[in-house]
Amino acid sequence: MEQGLSKHILIDESPGETRVAILKEGKLSDVFVERQHRPALKGSLILGKVQAVKKELNATFLDLGGATGYLEGIPKPSPIEGGALLVEVLSEPIDKKGARVTANFSLLGIMADITPNQTGYSISRDIKAKGRRASIRELLSNVIPKDIGVFIKSNANKCELAELEEELRTLLVDWERMQLDIVSGGQPKIVKPAASLMELRGDWRKNAIISQGKDGILFKKFNIDAQISGALESVVETQTGVVLTIEEMEALTAIDIDLASHKTAHSHPLKLAETLAEEIFWQIRLRKLSGIILIDYPRAKNLGARDHFHSEIKRIASQDEYKLVVHGWTRTGLLELTKDRLGPSLRDMFLCKNSVSQFLIEVIAIEACRTLITESDGIANPQLVCSQDLKSALLGPLRKTFDEVKRRLGVEVDFYVDLYLAHDDFYIQAKKTT
């Protein structure tokens, strides 16, 4: 790895799926997955259909088309049930919980954002020169309608005013197109899709080594799949011998710390507290835990160790973009943390609901597609031996992905359903001719 660069980003493009793994100091730090058959809603603009306006809950509920959404508060003028409302999706729907949305959305640019439902100008504090700020304000007064708000980012500090004007006019044209789409009716419908994984995470590339690959080969080289599987386990043994038990539930996550196997727990309590703070924060971020998180730190004669653990994990959280909030000790002696839920956890991304080990059928199906591409070379008539569930997934919601695999192979792929195979078992063989 190049000197001074501790972050390594692996990008894998496979049929039906894009995966990104972020390694820090050689260790898996984060995973992002985008599946073509299940596009993300977060960040999209949707013309939703108002289902209910609940004044007693101060909330508005919408049909987003395939998902429900809830808006905290009631916009003015108050929406009519059955009517249309344009909203931006702030968080993905999870299980029975709808997506969180807002009516105060923005159209994002590189140097500026416009807010169609708000008014007024705002210029980044990083743009400090009075002359520059005055020139930008004059430009805004000439270009931006009075009923639209705008925020000028720090990226506009050194650009030519003509470049900024061009971007502002492009954003306004985009908004006009959306309004025409809205007027045409037909809600619920997506007016502006969410940014792709690569667009959304453009900041990844800063101070990082980028490696790109296809069909899972790069992930195998760096043992990423095994590291993901490890992060899905509820029991983790750290390098120091401490055992962490991480129990994820719908409303909260409980983390238990077992020091029984740690020989120097009492001789070096402060050092141990620092090590555990780093490891537990790493696990929380990698697993994408959210909601209420309770940590049971063992009581000891040295109470300073618990306080040191508290201050260390708070320090680490304050320096990380994950935005974990460390509250303090509860009356029962548990350390309470919270994190807003904006998307699925690692378990939600890979495992079946209420299962500790069974992978989603879509995960197995996409892995089968990768295997067909990498291991069918030289087989004239490949046959996928699998469960009925896997076959149904490839011929159903993942049909486009399966068709892409056949196109790349240049041959038809036959199925053989083996009733004795488990949900996640499959293998490839040459089709037997009679």
Describe every region a protein language model picked out:
Residues 1-39, 44, 94, 102-146, ...:
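Extended, charged alpha/beta regions that create polyanion-binding interfaces
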Residues 2, 7-11, 16-24, 31-32, ...:
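S1/OB-fold single-stranded RNA-binding interface
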Residues 30-31, 69-72, 120-123, 254-255, ...:
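Short small-residue beta-strand/loop micro-motif enriched in glycine and branched aliphatics
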Residues 52, 59, 84, 149, ...:
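Residues at the N-termini of beta-strands
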Residues 58-64, 93-115, 171, 240-419, ...:
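Conserved glycine-centered short motifs in functionally critical loops
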Residues 77-81, 116, 153-156, 257-259, ...:
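Short loop/turn segments at strand-loop or loop-helix junctions that form parts
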Residues 147-152, 188-189, 206-210, 291-292, ...:
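Hydrophobic beta-strand segments of well-ordered beta-sheets in folded domains
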Residues 149-155, 334-337:
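A generic structural motif
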